C-alpha cells in the first residue's frame, strides 16, 4: 500500500475535495448542499480544508468552518471517507481543531443505510480522539408554520448594557440543562460560561438592539430572549429563564417573542436548536410550530 498524503487544499482544488465518492446520506450533502457552492459563498477556506490521498485519489476529507472574521475554526462539519483509518489519521495530522457537528436527517437511526454512515463517522472521529458530547434537534420555521400568538404574560425590554446581560447569564446558567454550558461550567467555571455566551451573541452579525430581557407584572426579571442572524440564516440566538421563575413555561413566551421579532423583519425562515435531553425546550419548540428539520451529534 502506498503512503498516505495528507494536506490542505490549494486554491482552486474544490473539485478534488468533491471527487470523493459519497452517497450523500449524512452531513451537508444530505440536505442538498455542496462544498464548492458553500466555498464560493465564503463558508470555507482552502487552508482549513484537508484531504487524505493515496495514489492521488482522495480517500478522506475534512473541512472546518468559521465566520469571515474568525482567526480559528469554530466547527468541523464536512468529514467523509472511503478509508476510516485514513480519516482518523487526517484529523490527527491536521493542526486544526473544533467541535465536530454531524448533521443527520430526522429519525436517522430508523434508516439502516443512514445509521451505518453516521456510525462510521462517529467511530472514525472517536479513533482520532474526539468524544460524543450531545445529540441535538435542529428546527426550521417558515411562514407557512404560522406565527404563534403572544401569551401576553411578560414585558420585553431592550437592555443595552452588556454587563447587565452578563449578570443575567450568570443567573440563567445555574442549573442549566444545556450540555455545552454544563461542560464549560465544569471545566472553567460559571463566569467563563456566562462570558462565552455573551461573546457568542456579540459575534452574531445581527443588531445588538434585538436583545430583550423579559419581566413579569411584578417587575421581576424572568429571562432573556435573543433573535438573531447567523452568517447563513436568521435564528433563535438564545432563550433562557432564571432559576426562580422556572417551571411556569416562560421559555415558550420567550421563544414566541423572538419568533415575532424575526417575522416582523420579513424573514422567510428561522433556524433553532436544542439538546434532545432538554425535554421542556423541545416541547416549547413543538408547541410554537417549529418542525424538526435535522438532528445533530456534537463530538469534542
Language-model segments: residues:
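Flexible, substrate/cofactor-facing loop regions flanked by secondary structure
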Residues: 30, 34, 149-234
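A short, well-structured alpha-helix characteristic of acyl/acetyltransferase catalytic modules
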Residues: 1-3, 7-25, 133, 138, ...
Amino acid at each position: 500500500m502506498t503512503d498516505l498524503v495528507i494536506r490542505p487544499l490549494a486554491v482552486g482544488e474544490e473539485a478534488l475535495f468533491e471527487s470523493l465518492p459519497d452517497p450523500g446520506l449524512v452531513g451537508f450533502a444530505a440536505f442538498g448542499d455542496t462544498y464548492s457552492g458553500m466555498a464560493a459563498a465564503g463558508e470555507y477556506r482552502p487552508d482549513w480544508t484537508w484531504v487524505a490521498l493515496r495514489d492521488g485519489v482522495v480517500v478522506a476529507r475534512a473541512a472546518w468552518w468559521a465566520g469571515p472574521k474568525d482567526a480559528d475554526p469554530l466547527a468541523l462539519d464536512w468529514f467523509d471517507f472511503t478509508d476510516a483509518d485514513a480519516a482518523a489519521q487526517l484529523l490527527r495530522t491536521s493542526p486544526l481543531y473544533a467541535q465536530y457537528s454531524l448533521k443527520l436527517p430526522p429519525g436517522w437511526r430508523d434508516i439502516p443505510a443512514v445509521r451505518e454512515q453516521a456510525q462510521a463517522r462517529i467511530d472514525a472521529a472517536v479513533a482520532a480522539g474526539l468524544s460524543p458530547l450531545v445529540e441535538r434537534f435542529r428546527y426550521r420555521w417558515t411562514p407557512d408554520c404560522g406565527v404563534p400568538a403572544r401569551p401576553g404574560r411578560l414585558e420585553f425590554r431592550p437592555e443595552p448594557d452588556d454587563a447587565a446581560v452578563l449578570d443575567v447569564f450568570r443567573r440563567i446558567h445555574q442549573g442549566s440543562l444545556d450540555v455545552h454550558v454544563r461542560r464549560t461550567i465544569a471545566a472553567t467555571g460559571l463566569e467563563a460560561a456566562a462570558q462565552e455566551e455573551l461573546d457568542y451573541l456579540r459575534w452574531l452579525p445581527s443588531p445588538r438592539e434585538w436583545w430583550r430581557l423579559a419581566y413579569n407584572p411584578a417587575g421581576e426579571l424572568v429571562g432573556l430572549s435573543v433573535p438573531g442572524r447567523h452568517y447563513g440564516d436568521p435564528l433563535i440566538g438564545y432563550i433562557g429563564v432564571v432559576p426562580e421563575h422556572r417551571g411556569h413555561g416562560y421559555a415558550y413566551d420567550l421563544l414566541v417573542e423572538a419568533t415575532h421579532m424575526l417575522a416582523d423583519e420579513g424573514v422567510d425562515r428561522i433556524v433553532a436548536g436544542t439538546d434532545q435531553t432538554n425535554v421542556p425546550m423541545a416541547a416549547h419548540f413543538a408547541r410554537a410550530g417549529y418542525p424538526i428539520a435535522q438532528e445533530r451529534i456534537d463530538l469534542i
